[in-house]
Amino acid sequence: MEVPVLIVGAGPVGLTMAALLADQGIASLLVEQRDGLHQAPQAHVVSARTREILASLGIADEALARVTTPPADARYVTWRRNLAEEDIARIEIGGEARFVQLDSVSGKRSANVPQHHLERVLFDALAGRTHCETRFGQTWRAAEEEGDRVVSRIEDAASGEVYAVRSQWLLAADGASSSVRRGAGIAMAGDTNLAHMVTVNFEADLRPLVKDSPSILFWTLSAKAPGTFIVHDAARYAVFMTPYFPPHEQPADFPVARCERMLRAALGTAEVPFRITSLSHWTMQAHVADRYRQGRTLLVGDAAHRFPPTGGLGLNTGIADAHNLAWKLALVMQGRAGEGLIDTYGAERRPVAVANCEASVKNFHKMREVTAAMGIDDRRLPLLGRVRSSAPARALPGAVRSAIGGLFVAPVEWRTRRIAKAASVRCAAIRQRVQRAAEDQMAHFSTVGLDLGHAYEGAAVRGDGTTAPVAPDPVRDVCQSLTPGARWPHFHLAPDAGVAYRTSSHELLKPGHFLLAGMGRHGPACERLAASLGLAVVGVNLDLAASHKALAQLIAWNDGQTDATLLVRPDGHIAWRSTAPQPPSLDEVSAALCAILQITPSRLLQPLDNKDMQ
């Protein structure tokens, strides 16, 4: 069979990629090795930028709200000895101050949406589109390039049949262990084996334990069961993650019975019944691919980068990858852009992945400051794993092994219990120190700068000699601007702007379309110019579309100048700006577009031929 695009991997990034391409008239086949969507939570942080992208796909806020942890239940991040005991430290990540900050820079707020629910929302959105087909139980085996096509070998799990799929492009969205990436010979570089984790998915009603500190995350500081609870739905289900320590311990050392004992210890009470629904194990890594393209194979999402989960950046970086690539791929396939535009994908997105990877690793190491503030040495935990798993220890009776383990566990348990209860003046002082260390972790949970603040450079941006402003804290804050390369800023529209029920400037962006927006003397010309460009361009007069307050913001973002024309790419990043006294001519705007798309003016105006794309 032959398809325009073959996408391998039906996780959130692959599903998003297929939907974005479909909306631009590009057909795809999406194949997935699993026999269906994920059934358990994995990633769960959905950032403001990701929600903007999902909204562009027509996914309504109401659809996400039905599967989102209520903000009131995800207000804090808390540290306890176990889930049943009192807080040792707590920080607020979902308070009003943070919402005010988010609302000033985006029309969407970040949310906790468990991945298996997000996949279902995306799959349902994809099912309503033409130009895309999804097949489960299909394993990608190999590929080779033949001229301007890639021939992939796919194995059907049900029949065992191996069949060929010819495509113009092959997209690897098959996760951190990507077979497609390995097949393309693309290497990953970075930190390996940062940690090894067992994940316990379980059902329980945790409301009696968490009602006084409604938190999305609870860190348990018990030596019996150190780890992290992710409380997606306190009434129904949650996740517990705990480390193990190769080579002394292996996943096989954690059967259901042992995980039940560890989970009971982490809960800290026998009063809460639970049922383990699944177990998994994984290795925490921090890798970024050397390149995002090899011939006609492109990497997106975790196939291109894998981060520690500390920061919740992985899924969101992947969704933004798809958003950056989809419009470029569509225009190249439609003959409206030169193939060099594809190379700007890796040039723009790889630096973002490197920055997000570094931030995630920093967060991971910084979390140790909390246990260090308690006077606990994390290095004792691998030693415990070594002792309890050594050959001599395994030969001992269970009671003796427990006694040996107790030599390591008891001092830590005694210390954390006294600190939690502030049992002495010294313990109270330590608890205050732990609280300060916890408060110093906010960069882990507030990453709006990383989410919205990056500005692209390179061939797909026509710079004007200015540099996008950078916030004093580029992780937690963002400075909006009209600088080429920056994200199109969020501002409020006028009530009578002709876009009923739309409040954010991002509602002006139409999938697969450029936006030509003008202010001051440039405004009226932009609507006229947009209709003459021979490409999908929406023209907007910002003097009419923006609210009165927003116009003042726009002038400030434009370095105090009242006149400007802004060409915004389909992925919502500013491609070009003119601040000349007079509006730009059609030739000037066409020249900017042609430079970005790497084509001649004659190709810009030629009729669109989509017959090979569907």
Residue spans for each PLM region:
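Conserved FAD-binding catalytic core of PHBH/FMO-like flavoproteins
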Residues: 63, 124, 169, 173-284
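Core beta-strand elements of the Rossmann-like FAD/NAD(P) dinucleotide-binding domain
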Residues: 3, 159-169
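N-terminal Rossmann-fold NAD(P) dinucleotide-binding loop
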Residues: 14-15
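Active-site-adjacent segment of FAD-dependent monooxygenases/related oxidoreductases
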Residues: 42, 47-125, 221
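Glycine-rich FAD pyrophosphate-binding loop
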Residues: 22-42
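A conserved short coil-to-beta-strand element within the FAD-binding core of flavoproteins
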Residues: 136-150
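Helical substrate-recognition/capping region of FAD-dependent monooxygenase/halogenase enzymes
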Residues: 2-4, 8, 23-24, 33, ...
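FAD/FMN-dependent oxidoreductases across multiple families
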Residues: 252-313, 317, 337, 352, ...
